[in-house]
Amino acid sequence: MARSVVAALLVLLSLSGLEAIQHAPKIQVYSRHPAENGKPNYLNCYVSGFHPSDIEVDLLKNGQKIENVEHSDLSFSKDWSFYLLYYTEFTPNEKDEYACRVSHVTFPTPKTVKWDRNM
């Protein structure tokens, strides 16, 4: 009986330790197709390798939050870190700037990564 109690406590302690691990998200911003001015495309923000799972992701156009953004379900990798894809349809041009802003416990302030049309 005592062994099973000790084993159960060890399992609980190891599981609670997962929440203590924090990994900053890797942020990748890219378009589905090569950018062509005036041609509809999709803007993607792939956020991966983060822990814990609480995260806020916004796609931005000229610094303003884009509405009607879709995202994948929250998923996890073999190492128990999480990943998500946020995306929206957009039509690139020369004057507009697009970016992805991410808020996570590992960042003191939200981190913004700009879309590079040449990537």
UniProtKB/Swiss-Prot annotation:
A Pfam match: C1-set
Keyword Ligase annotated: no
Predominant location category: secreted
Any GO BP annotation: antigen processing and presentation of peptide antigen via MHC class I
Gene3D superfamilies: Immunoglobulins
Localization in the cell: Secreted
Gene Ontology terms: cellular component: extracellular region; MHC class I protein complex
Domain Ig-like C1-type: 25-114
Keywords for the protein's UniProt record, in alphabetical order: Disulfide bond, Immunity, Immunoglobulin domain, MHC I, Secreted, Signal
Signal peptide: 1-20
Highest taxon of the lineage: Eukaryota
Cystine pairings recorded for this chain: 45-100
Keyword Cell membrane included in the entry's annotation: no
Assembly notes: Heterodimer of an alpha chain and a beta chain. Beta-2-microglobulin is the beta-chain of major histocompatibility complex class I molecules.
Family: Belongs to the beta-2-microglobulin family.
Role summary: Component of the class I major histocompatibility complex (MHC). Involved in the presentation of peptide antigens to the immune system.
Protein name as catalogued: Beta-2-microglobulin
Species this protein is from: Saimiri boliviensis boliviensis (Bolivian squirrel monkey)
